[in-house]
A protein has these predicted regions:
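Metal-dependent amide/peptide-bond hydrolase catalytic core
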Residues: 1-118
Length: 118
């Protein structure tokens, strides 16, 4: 928080103030860790794609566990019917085939994660 205040003061001078800043220790697991490599390999094996792991801003439930990440398919290219809402939105929807594919990914990933040393 102090670093943010200092940076803002350098950029804005006295034209702005920063109050009630809170921050958390960053939560990060390296992309080359065995667990992340197992997850992305599993995803790519099931889907036939060649995706790379990525990080995102914001907080997730994963930070409440000692060694966890958010993981799952994201299909922004799929056209949904009018009644289906976007990911994490009201009436979230996806085609049934993609639900089955996700289930395969999760089951295989869990089986593979049991075989590695964390």
């Amino acid at each position: 928080a102090e670093h943010l205040t200092e940076m803002m003061t350098q950029v804005c001078g006295t034209a702005a103030t920063l109050e009630d800043v809170s921050s958390r220790v960053p939560f990060y697991i390296a992309a080359d860790s065995p667990a992340i490599q197992t997850l992305i390999t599993t995803y790519n094996d099931v889907t036939g794609e060649n995706k790379k792991p990525f990080t995102m801003g914001g907080g997730t439930y994963a930070r409440h566990f000692p060694y966890a990440v958010s993981f799952g398919p994201e299909h922004t290219d799929i056209e949904l019917p009018e009644f289906a809402g976007p990911m994490h939105g009201a009436n979230e929807g996806t085609p049934f085939e993609k639900l089955i594919e996700a289930l395969k990914i999760y089951i295989l990933a869990l089986l593979r994660l049991q075989e590695i040393e964390l």
